[in-house]
A protein has these predicted regions:
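Conserved acidic donor-binding segment of nucleotide-sugar-dependent glycosyltransferases
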Residues: 311, 315-322, 331-336
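Conserved donor-binding/catalytic core segment of Leloir-type glycosyltransferases
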Residues: 178-194, 200-203, 216-218
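Short hydrophobic beta-strand element within catalytic cores of glycosyltransferases
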Residues: 296-299
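Short acidic/histidine- and often glycine-rich active-site loop of Leloir-type glycosyltransferases
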Residues: 283, 302-316
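A short, well-ordered alpha-helix in the C-terminal region of glycosyltransferases
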Residues: 324, 331, 338-352
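Donor nucleotide-sugar binding/catalytic pocket of nucleotide-sugar-dependent glycosyltransferases
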Residues: 127-167, 178
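Glycan-recognition and catalytic cores of secretory/periplasmic carbohydrate-active enzymes
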Residues: 356-358, 364, 368-744
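Nucleotide-activated donor-binding/catalytic signature segment of Leloir-type glycosyltransferases, i.e.
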Residues: 229-256
Length: 744
């Protein structure tokens, strides 16, 4: 229940974005209908329900309509005092007295130190519900302290933000031909509360020392402030620009921008000026959006900025203090490194507030309130190769990434290029997209260049395509070598659909590696190599390859017999990373040799691993903060995408052979870790680029999107494409589209 676009107000846009986030994350599991709030009867309603907020009887009519709709399970009221008629909007009580569905609220304003009448009214509102959302911790504290509301019914959810691909301002400015300019910006529906005058007056002082500054004032004037076609506030601002002689330094963008264009302007901003003058403004969407686009900020002190804007992200100044705005802005303009670091800190800080993560918080609360056992499943994101391609040069896939910017100085590894070859090959097999082939050639060529005369491989190559001799000498390269064999085998297994030159190169490298493969000792290396050997043998049966598989996996059996006990059915006295490859190796050895011992150990060891990763408390990734040793308690946190991806790959192999439906359920549970079913309830991928985040820590996500994490996420996502299910048929009842309008 809310205003909704095309109505031009911040709450309308907030509601639209919240719903889009929910639909993006949960898809066909749920539908959202709108009860649109209007000030007068609407001739042609576009939403499922419409409420004339000035008609007291209409509140009862709408409540009865909703009561009679069996599909409606919950009513979520977006609450602002000005949205509803009556004293403090008390017409809403007519609806609450009549509605029989569960109700929750979002309070967009929480007024501290209320008078007795306001306090009584707010407590009365919440007597109709045991749930309310607020957007700041301070709002939660005010409700508890000033209104005597119990903490258990309050859910703190940050104002949502759009996920963007990180860029430096200089990169983003190219789109707007603003290279070389120092860009300041402010956006939103303009009005007196925005206090743009302060920004302009500060600008007149700033340009004395920084004449190359351009101040973007983005957005239309609030429609309620345009009377008889006269835009008094904008006229006032333009007159001030004239008075201060700032024509060369100010650009009014007097239009509603679509979301992506707005975000591009924010990414091109060197410093965002948040000039609001309302000391009681609980939350600001414009402030949140600016931080999420990596803008360093100079911001007025309001409750939201005081709570969120730490000194490593920007500077807080007194409301309306022109000198403080100018001084802080000049300080930041004089230090490029400081601005860049502040922008990155702001970007990292706001990722938890993405609309996808906000949707998860809402849905977790909704499921507590809905009065039946409705199953709500995650929807699978679109398969995206944007970041994979961004990480790839003509030499190969770059190892690391600084947020989403590839770090060329980190060089290249056989590990990453082998994984990339497997993943992009899977994508080609699924889609037949010939744009994948040049990338497969790049990764294959890298593997080919890494191969030594004896058939083994080096792993580390620098940005100039030179071998890292010391690193390759110091590090045990068995795992990376074995991954190379896995990748080569995966290509050869696709020989019927790939160009001959790709298959020929892969076959040449593969056969050359076989004498080395016989000598592998480490368990995981045996597993990776066995996977490649099995894939080769599945399309080109070869007694020598079969013999190597048997020889290697006999070593694994020996390991198992040494270490396995009644309560620890495993190949070693510890669980580390990529554990699923070991039972998977046993499975492939069984499929090639038909020896019962391999099947027995494959199933026993997989069951043991699943018992450690899938518990009554949910899915648990083996922590890299300290491996899980036999007889000890497992460590917490320090979770990496590679382990999640590997268990999905393992379960996929076992499901394909044994068709045990439990394996499929485990796969879905594990993949949900990427989608937000983890201890932070946050997504582990970038939905815009397909980048995979590098790790899930105790309190935060590592937002770097390196090769390993990105390819592991992609591999898991490609596997899950085979298991996509429409759980139920749902009609999308969101009928309107509008450009982004924010007035908060």
């Amino acid at each position: 229940m809310s205003t909704y676009p095309p109505t031009q107000c911040g709450i309308a846009t907030y509601t639209q974005d919240t719903i889009k986030g929910i639909m993006d994350v949960y898809g066909n599991s749920i539908s959202c209908e709108i009860c649109e709030l209007v000030k007068s009867p609407k001739e042609n309603p576009t939403q499922a329900f419409t409420l004339n907020t000035n008609d007291k009887e209409d509140y009862i009519r709408v409540a009865e309509e909703i009561n009679n709709d069996d599909l409606v399970k919950l009513v979520h009221i977006q609450h602002e005092f000005g949205l509803f008629a009556g004293n403090y909007g008390d017409y809403l009580l007519e609806f609450l007295n009549a509605i029989k569905k569960p109700v929750t609220f979002t309070f967009h304003s929480v007024i501290q130190n209320p008078n007795k009448e306001l306090k009584t009214f707010v407590k009365l509102l919440l007597s109709y519900s045991n749930s309310v959302f607020v957007m700041t911790n301070q709002s939660q504290e005010i409700l508890m302290r000033d209104y005597d509301i119990h903490q258990e019914i309050i859910t703190c959810v940050p104002h949502g933000t759009h996920v963007v691909v990180y860029e430096t301002p200089e990169q983003a400015k190219q789109k707007f031909n603003m290279e070389g300019k120092k860009v300041l910006s402010t956006f939103g529906l303009l009005g007196e509360g925005k206090n743009i005058e302060t920004g302009l007056q500060a600008l007149s002082k700033i340009v004395e020392k920084e004449p190359n500054v351009l101040y973007l004032i983005i957005g239309r004037t609030h429609p309620n402030l345009i009377l008889d076609g006269v835009d008094v506030y904008r006229d006032k601002l333009e007159a001030l620009v004239d008075e201060l002689n700032l024509h060369n330094n100010v650009c009014f963008i007097n239009q509603y921008l679509d979301t992506n264009e707005l975000l591009d302007y924010l990414k091109a901003t060197d410093i965002y000026l948040f000039t609001s003058k309302d000391p009681n403004q609980a939350v600001s969407g414009t402030f949140a959006y600016a931080m999420s686009c990596a803008c360093p900020l100079v911001a007025s002190k309001i409750p939201h900025t005081l709570e969120v804007l730490s000194s490593d992200c920007g500077v807080l100044v007194d409301i309306g203090n022109v000198d403080q705005f100018a001084e802080a802005t000049l300080k930041l303009l004089s230090d490029d490194n400081l601005r860049e670091e502040m922008g990155k800190n702001a970007f990292r800080k706001m990722r938890a507030s993405s609309w996808e993560n906000v949707a998860i918080i809402h849905m977790n609360r909704y499921t507590d309130l809905i009065e039946n056992d409705t199953i709500i499943d995650f929807d699978y994101p679109e398969i995206q190769l944007t970041h994979v391609k961004k990480l790839t040069t003509e030499l190969g896939m770059i190892q690391f990434s600084n947020i989403s910017i590839p770090d060329l100085s980190s060089g290249y590894t056989l590990d990453d290029n082998a994984r990339a070859l497997v993943a992009v090959g899977m994508h080609y097999k699924l889609t037949g997209d010939k744009n994948d082939l040049p990338y497969m050639l790049i990764y294959l060529d890298f593997i080919h260049r890494c191969q030594k005369p004896d058939g083994s491989f080096i792993n580390y190559v620098d940005e100039h395509n030179r071998e890292h001799i010391e690193q390759n000498a110091e590090v045990n390269l068995e795992d990376s070598n074995a991954r190379g064999i896995w990748a080569l085998g995966s290509v050869i297994a696709m020989k019927d659909i790939l160009p001959e030159n790709i298959v020929h190169t892969a076959s040449e490298c593969f056969l050359k590696s076989l004498p080395w493969a016989e000598t592998i000792q480490s368990p995981r290396s045996i597993g990776f190599a066995t996977k490649g050997l099995y894939l080769y043998n599945s399309v080109i049966p070869n007694l020598y390859v079969s013999a190597i598989i048997n020889k290697l996996n006999a070593k694994l059996v020996s390991n198992y017999e040494i270490h396995a006990t009644k309560d620890w059915k495993w190949f070693e006295n510890y669980l580390t990373y990529g554990n699923g490859i070991l039972p998977e190796s046993m499975l492939y050895a069984y499929l090639v040799t038909n020896k019962p011992i391999y099947k027995k150990i494959a199933l026993e060891s997989l069951d043991f691993l699943l018992s450690k990763m899938f518990t009554k408390n949910g899915f648990r990734v083996i922590s890299n903060n300290g491996w899980y040793h036999k007889g000890a308690e497992p460590k917490e946190y320090g979770e990496q995408p590679i382990d999640v991806s590997y268990i999905i790959q393992t379960l996929n192999g076992f499901y394909n052979e044994f068709k045990n439906p439990l394996y499929k359920e485990y796969m879905k549970t594990a993949f949900n870790w990427f989608l937000g079913k983890n201890h932070l309830n946050q997504i582990m991928y970038n939905p815009v680029s397909g980048g995979g985040y590098d790790g899930l820590e105790k309190d935060n996500i590592n937002l770097n999107q390196g090769a390993e994490s990105t390819v592991c996420y992609l591999t898991a996502r490609l596997i899950m494409e085979n298991f996509k299910e429409a759980e139920c048929k749902v009609i999308d009842l969101i009928k309107t589209k509008a450009d982004l309008i924010i007035n908060s």
